[in-house]
Swiss-Prot record:
Reaction catalysis annotation: adenosine(1518)/adenosine(1519) in 16S rRNA + 4 S-adenosyl-L-methionine = N(6)-dimethyladenosine(1518)/N(6)-dimethyladenosine(1519) in 16S rRNA + 4 S-adenosyl-L-homocysteine + 4 H(+)
Residues annotated to bind S-adenosyl-L-methionine: 21, 23, 48, 69, 94, 115
Species per Swiss-Prot/TrEMBL record: Clostridium botulinum (strain Langeland / NCTC 10281 / Type F)
UniProt-recorded name of the protein: Ribosomal RNA small subunit methyltransferase A
Keywords attached to this entry: Cytoplasm, Methyltransferase, RNA-binding, rRNA processing, S-adenosyl-L-methionine, Transferase
Primary role: Specifically dimethylates two adjacent adenosines (A1518 and A1519) in the loop of a conserved hairpin near the 3'-end of 16S rRNA in the 30S particle. May play a critical role in biogenesis of 30S subunits.
Length: 275
């Protein structure tokens, strides 16, 4: 059965508070599966399985699938629809409260697949990356604007701290755009399927990741301000900051959105050296 048929079969009522939008376009489903590159060696962690349409395809291809679902009304539906699969584990919990490192412990070749409610997109991605969860890739359907921020390059309005965070840890690839007509109920925004491939090492080697991300966040907190003004929040004396900018070879009159990840790394290391 397809998604609409399962929804009708169980007379499922969508929960607006959970931002539920179920995928009904099979071509998108196929592109997610193909983009995620799932094999029998892979353990898949799925966030937001809905009624299990994508989950079935994952179960057919993966070694095992762990699906995390918050909505208690979906649990019996998923249990019934997927009862024939012995490589399926259903976790009734809020993904924001999951200990992903514990879940991934002693598992190899972990890939994440998710149709994330828009309100949890950034917190989930940030946790998976900053907590150093051991996954190979993350294939997600997210709001178009967020995907464009993740995939952005310097000198454009989409480029920001989320861009730097994700691209510090991952290569990014947009798989396809998805229209609101591909869901029930129909969302008010366009979506994008994007894949994040985890790098074996961060994109730049820095002396302090904590300082690096502090510099990045401060640089984007007030986008229209120069780096010199934005980084005053670090509470470093004027002479030391002048020295750091000079050693990094970066003009303090530039704005954060003009710096590459490599330049942020160079600047944060020069600040680290003078602290």
């Amino acid at each position: 059965m397809n998604t609409k048929e399962i929804v009708n079969k169980y007379e499922f009522k969508f929960n607006k508070n959970l931002g539920q939008n179920f995928l009904i376009d099979e071509s998108v489903l196929e592109d997610i599966i193909e983009g995620a590159e799932i094999s029998k060696e892979d353990t898949v962690i799925e966030i937001g399985p809905g009624v299990g349409t994508l989950t079935k395809e994952l179960l057919e291809r993966a070694k095992e699938v762990y699906s995390i679902e918050l909505d208690g009304d979906l649990i019996p539906i998923l249990q019934e629809e997927l009862k024939e699969y012995n490589n399926f584990t259903l976790i009734h919990k809020d993904a924001l409260k999951i200990d992903f490192n514990e879940l991934m412990e002693n598992k190899e070749s972990i890939k994440l697949v998710a149709n994330l409610p828009y309100y949890v997109t950034t917190p989930i991605i940030s946790r998976l990356l900053t907590e150093k969860c051991d996954f190979k890739s993350l294939t997600i359907m997210i709001q178009k604007e967020v995907a464009e921020r993740i995939n952005a390059e310097p000198n454009c309005k989409e480029y920001g701290s989320l861009t730097v965070l994700v691209q510090y840890y991952c290569n990014t690839k947009i798989i396809r755009k998805v229209s609101p007509n591909s869901f029930i109920p129909r969302p008010k925004v366009d979506s994008i399927v994007i894949k994040l491939d985890r790098l074996s090492e961060p994109r730049v080697r820095v002396k302090s990741q904590k300082l690096f991300f502090n510099v990045v966040r401060s640089s984007f907190n007030m986008r229209r301000k120069t780096l010199w003004n934005s980084l005053k929040s670090l509470n470093i004396d004027k002479e030391s900051m002048e020295n750091a900018f000079e050693r990094a070879g970066i003009d303090p009159k530039r704005r954060g959105e003009t710096l590459s990840i490599e330049e942020f790394g160079k600047l944060s290391d020069c600040i680290y050296d003078i602290l």
